[in-house]
Amino acid sequence: MLEDNERVDHLIKEGYEIIQNDEVFSFSTDALLLGYLTEVRKNDKVMDLCSGNGVIPLLLAAKSTQPIEGIEIQEQLVSMARRSFKLNDLNDRLTMHRMDLKDVYQTFQPAQYTLVTC
């Protein structure tokens, strides 16, 4: 499950694990604050832009049973996020799309989502 230079870190409060790699994006305090301070309502349709390794979808998944989608352009980070979702048995609720933000409107419509993080 882990590739070169990767490690598994723990999101202790949520009881989840996340794959990280110091050679690419690793989450920090700002991502934790965004995840902790974001309120997910019962019927929200959630999208996280520039998702990196999927930390925000993981943090929000601990607050809600709603499906959450993420968008990230870097293939390595998309792979790490998808493997983290699988590691936590969240593949049924969390989806990561590899996509440039310039192309989002070709696939998704803004009205589809009631909560967008970035």
Where is each model-derived feature located?
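Class I SAM-dependent transferase core
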Residues: L2-R41
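Conserved SAM/SAH cofactor-binding pocket of Class I
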Residues: L37-C118
